[in-house]
Each structure stands twice: as C-alpha cells, then as structure tokens.
Regions:
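N-terminal beta1-alpha1 cap of cysteine-dependent amidohydrolase-like domains
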Residues: 1-145, 150-187, 195-224
C-alpha cells in the first residue's frame, strides 16, 4: 500500500512549538494507525504557483501561524476549500476559513467587525474547555480529555454564527464561553476546522483523535 501524503501549508518556524507538534502528531497517528505518512511543509506563496492537480493525491493541513504573508495564506485557504482534498485547519486558519465565507457569500454587508483579532498574544498557550455539541465532537471527546491548548482565541459575532450554522457549517464543539471551537464544512465533511491546537495534546501513547480522523480521511482518498 502506498504511503499517505500530506501537504502542511504554513511557514515552518523551528521556534514555534505548535509547528513541531504538528509534525509529531502525524508521527503519533502513523504509529497508532500503522500507516506510513509522508508529510511536507509548503509555504502558502509556493502553493499558489502549483499546477491544478499537483496535490491531487494529498491531504492538506492548514497549519497554525504565524504567517509571513496573510494574503498568501488566505489564498491557500480558498484553494483548499474549493478543492476535493481532505483537510485539517488548526489555529489561525480558523479565522481565515470564517473570513472566506463572509467575503465569498457577502455575509457582512455593513462591513462590521464580525470576528475579533486574536486575543492570545505571542508564542504561548492558553487552556480551553471543549464542550462537544455535534456528532463528530461527541465522538472525539468520548475518548479524549476535553481540556485543550490554544494560541488563538477569536470571538465571532453571534448572528454570523447562526447564519454560518444554517447554511455552511456543522458546529461540533464550543468552549466554556459558548464560542465555536470546532466545526466541519456542511458540504465538505472531510474538512475539519479547529480554533485550538489538538496537535499539542497528542502523544505517542494517545494520539489525538482529531488527527486520527484527518489521517483516516486522507487514507480513504488514497484507496479510491
């Protein structure tokens, strides 16, 4: 059986623990699922120069920041959403996915600030209490600690959440403040979006089930 191929889209920085944890969490899932995984970091600016089907056999992880150029990362988010590739988004990419829908479907006609800036500063982690509300979230947290770590906190305008929930996303978990923390795209259930960083709490003995779910989606693609 051929190896699972995963493109990690982001600007790798050895000084950021979240970037190291991204690599390690894939190693954890590879060992747990007994599947070979080949993963590669690709800068967002490089992705936009790829040929249309160059990543056809890949899964994509839209990695946490910081990003050297937010414009290129936003473009990468758009490309992935409009592709047929299974994807995982963690950290700052949460903001960019929401922003994509707001702009693509004109969900903010008054041009108000409907999603806050990141409320966590620097290379630090805050804890967040996850409360599963959807089937995927309930399944994930039936076997995993509901305390997660995050370097990103965004507050989304409640009315926008309702519009997104009605037409565009399945909310799978909130936090203790009832802010959305985990969702999947309604028309692409193989795209998982987490505001927090599940890779941080993944270990070799207990790989994070969100990472496992993403890897399984990539595996299904290789078997088609």
């Amino acid at each position: 059986m051929s190896a699972i191929k995963i493109a990690i889209i982001g600007d790798f920085n050895f000084a950021y623990n979240a970037h190291h944890a991204t690599n390690l969490s894939l190693d954890h899932s590879s060992n747990f699922l007994d599947e070979e995984i080949n993963y590669y970091w690709i800068r967002p600016s490089e992705l936009l120069s790829f040929k249309k089907n160059e990543l056809l056999d890949y899964g994509v992880w839209l990695a946490p920041g910081p990003y050297l150029n937010e414009f290129y990362f936003s473009g990468a988010v758009k490309e992935v959403i409009n592709s047929k590739l299974p994807a995982l988004v963690t950290g700052e990419g949460f903001y960019h996915v929401i922003d994509y829908y707001v702009k693509q479907y004109s969900l903010n006609p008054r041009n108000e600030k409907v999603i806050s800036d990141n409320l966590v500063s620097g290379n630090q982690f805050d804890s967040v209490q996850i409360a599963p509300v959807g089937s995927f979230g309930i399944k994930i947290y039936s076997t995993h600690n509901s305390i997660e770590l995050t370097s990103t906190r965004f507050s989304v305008y409640p009315n926008l959440v309702e519009v997104l929930r009605d037409d565009f996303i399945y909310v799978d978990a909130n936090d203790q403040f009832d802010e959305v923390q985990l969702f999947r795209l309604a028309d692409r259930l193989d795209i998982i979006v987490a505001m927090y960083l599940p890779q941080i709490s993944s270990t070799r003995d207990l790989p994070h089930p969100i990472i496992n779910a993403f890897v399984r989606a990539c595996l299904e693609k290789t078997e088609v």
